[in-house]
Amino acid sequence: MLTPLTAFAGVRLRWPAMMRLTCIGILAQFALLLLAFGVLTYCFLISDFSVIYVAQHSYSLLSWELKLAAVWGGHEGSLLLWVLLLSAWSALFAWHYRQQTDPLFPLTLAVLSLMLAALLLFVVLWSDPFVRIFPPAIEGRDLNPMLQHPGLIFHPPLLYLGYGGLMVAASVALASLLRGEFDGACARICWRWALPGWSALTAGIILGSWWAYCELGWGGWWFWDPVENASLLPWLSATALLHSLSLTRQRGIFCHWSLLLAIVTLMLSLLGTLIVRSGILVSVHAFALDNVRAVPLFSLFALISLASLALYGWRARDGGPAVHFSGLSREMLILATLLLFCAVLLIVLVGTLYPMIYGLLGWGRLSVGAPYFNRATLPFGLLMLVVIVLATFVSGKRVQLPALVAHAGVLLFAAGVVVSSVSRQEISLNLQPGQQVTLAGYTFRFECLDLQAKGNYTSEKAIVALFDHQQRIGELTPERRFYEARRQQMMEPSIRWNGIHDWYAVMGEKTGPDRYAFRLYVQSGVRWIWGGGLLMIAGALLSGWRGKKRDE
C-alpha cells in the first residue's frame, strides 16, 4: 500500500525523491513476489506435501514439467502467478520510464500499484498458497488429469501475461484521465504496452484451443465454454482498442473510443478471473472451488470497474478534433471495425453471463451452447471479413506490411473455420482387434491393445493402423488412462496430420470381450486456424517493431 501513496505524493508535491522511491518499491515488490513464487515452485518440485496446495494438486510420480504446470493448476497458484506477472509488467514499466518527469508515468504506477495491492490483499486473505498441514500428507491427490498436457505448461502463463500487458495499457489510460489529458502521445504509450499484451493473450488462446482439440476428445477446437469465453472477451475489446489507438496516436481522434475500450478491456480481464476462479459458472474446465471466494472476487471486480468508469465520467473531456467521414475512408472502416467487435463482444458477454444471472435469480440452471454463439456471431464475422478486404484493397494509401500480415492471418483463420466445418466426417462404432472401418476414403484398422503403466497412471492403448488405398500411412494410438491417485479415468485422443488432413481417434468404454467403442474423425483445415492466429501475432509484433523504430 505504500507504493501508490508515494506515487501520488510524488506527483502532488513534485518531489523527485518520492518518484524514485515508487520505482524502488515496485521493483522490490516484484523481487519479493518472484521469491514467493520460486518457493512455491520448489515445494512442488520436491513434493512437499506439508503444503496443502501442493498436496491437492501434485503427486510424487509426476514428471518435473507437469509439476511445474501444477504450480498454476489450481486457484491459489494461478492467482499468485497473475499477481507476479502483473508485478513484472509494472517493474518493467517503472524501469523503462524511470528518468521521465511527466506526471503520467508516476500516476500510471500509482494505478498499477493500487490494483496490485487489491489483488495481493485477496491472495493473502482468501487465496494463500502456503497454508500448511501437520502431519504432512503421505501422498498428493495428483494434478487434474485434464490439465496433464504440454499445452497447459504455457497456456495459463501466456493468458496472465496478456492480461498484465493490457492492464498496463488501461492504467496509462486511467492515469491520463487523472492528469486531465489524453492525446496522441498518451495513445502511443498505451498502444506500445497493449500490443505485446494482446500478442501474449492471442498466443494463450491459440494454445488453449490446441489443448481443447487434443485433450477433450470431441474433435473440435472451440466449445464456447464460459472459461474459453472469459479469455475471448478481453481479446475482442483489446483488438478493438488497438484499432482505435492506431488513429488516436496518429491523428488524435477517437479518444473517447480508446479510453472506453481500455477501461472495458481492464474490466473484462478482471471478469475473466471472476468467471474462471469463482466457481459460479459451469464449465468443462471447472475446478472444485470454494464459492466463498466468489464474493470478494466480485467485490474486487465491481470496485475497480466502478472506480474506472466513474473516473472516465468525471475527467473525460473533449474527444479531440472532429472526425469527418468520407466514403470508404480509413476512419470509416475502423469505425465499422469497432462497432462490429463491440457487437460480437456483447453477444458473447450475454451468452456467457445469462446462465449466471438466471441462476442467481433462482430460476434454475441452464447453459447457452454453441448454436447460439455460432448463429449470432456469424453475420458479424462475415461483415468483418468484408471490412478487412475493403481496408486492404479499397484504401487509396499504400497498405502497411504489418496490417497485411495480420489481416492475412484473419483470412487464413476464417478459411480454416469454414474448411474444417465443411470437411468434417465422423463415425462412432464398436471394434475388436482385426476389424476395420472406412471413413472419407481412409481405412482405420484396430490391430491390438497395449497395456502400459506410466508414472502416475495405467493405460489401455489401442493400436489403430491408418491406410490410404491399401497403403499404410501411419497409426493412431488412442488411450484410456486410469489415474490411481484421483481414481479417475480419462480418454486420451490420438491425432495424426499431414499439413492438410487430420485423422482423429478416441477410444471409449469396453463394450464386450475384446471390444471397444471408438469415435473416428477425418477433417481438413484445422491447422489453418492456429496458423492464422500465429500470423496475427506476427503482424502485431512487426507493427510494434516498426512503431518503436519510428518513435526512435
UniProtKB/Swiss-Prot annotation:
Chief location category = membrane
- Specify the protein's topology with respect to the membrane: Multi-pass membrane protein
GO MF terms held by the record: heme binding; heme transmembrane transporter activity
Q: Which compartments does it reside in?
A: Cell inner membrane
Q: Where are the transmembrane segments?
A: 26-46, 77-97, 105-125, 158-178, 193-213, 228-247, 256-276, 294-314, 333-353, 376-396, 399-419, 525-545
KW Cell inner membrane (keyword) present: yes
The record's keywords, sorted A to Z, are:
Cell inner membrane, Cell membrane, Cytochrome c-type biogenesis, Membrane, Transmembrane, Transmembrane helix
GO biological process, alphabetically ordered: cytochrome complex assembly
Phenotype on deletion? Triple nrfE-nrfF-nrfG deletion mutants no longer attach heme 1 (covalently attached to 'Cys-122', the CWSCK motif) of cytochrome c552 (AC P0ABK9).
Renumbered to this chain, the signal peptide range is none
Q: Which PANTHER family match?
A: CYTOCHROME C ASSEMBLY PROTEIN-RELATED, CYTOCHROME C-TYPE BIOGENESIS PROTEIN NRFE-RELATED
| The family this protein is said to belong to | Belongs to the CcmF/CycK/Ccl1/NrfE/CcsA family.
The record's listing under NCBIfam families reads: nrfE, PRK10369.1
The protein here is known as Probable cytochrome c-type biogenesis protein NrfE
Query: Which gene does this sequence derive from?
Result: nrfE
